[in-house]
Amino acid sequence: MFDLELLGRPEGEGDRLFIWGRIRLGQFQDEFQVPLYDWAPGDYAAQWLEAAERLIHGAPVVVFLTHMMHPTAGYHMGWPAWREGDKVLVQERLFLPEQLGGPIDLEHPETHLGPRQEISDEGLRISQWSVTVRDVAAFVERRRRSSVPA
């Protein structure tokens, strides 16, 4: 199972406006706040769908952005997904400006990734989940059939 969705209605106001999001990777699921400062819910849904489509059509890596303020913000968050054959390996990632070398590339945020790592610089194992390309294709199909955004 692979799924990314937005839950409920926006909460907060101004630059603290957000909506809850959820990712499902096999049996794992995580809920997170999705800021609505610069991007609207439809922007996230469109980015997720576009990234998933690129992945199932052969892209070796994509990033599903889940925390986007503006390209020059203090940080961004997303879920990089590396395709290895029929398997997709997914990690959560914090993108910091000093690691990006400039504003984040919204069209192709994966350009900021580098190779997939399983051990952090501190020597700790990086959490990683495995789904299949078929799981990601099913996500695309569900989103294409649904009139409800992510």
PLM features: what roles do these ranges have?
Residues 1-75, 83:
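N-terminal low-complexity, intrinsically disordered segments
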Residues 20-23, 88-92:
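Short, hydrophobic/proline-enriched secondary-structure or compact coil segments at domain edges
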Residues 45-46, 86-88, 102-104, 112:
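Short, surface-exposed linear patches
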Residues 50-52, 90-93, 118-119:
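Short, surface-exposed, polar/charged, turn-prone segments marking secondary-structure boundaries
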Residues 80-85, 90-91, 97-98:
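Intrinsically disordered, flexible peripheral segments
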Residues 94-150:
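Mixed-charge, glycine-accented linear interaction segment located at domain edges/termini
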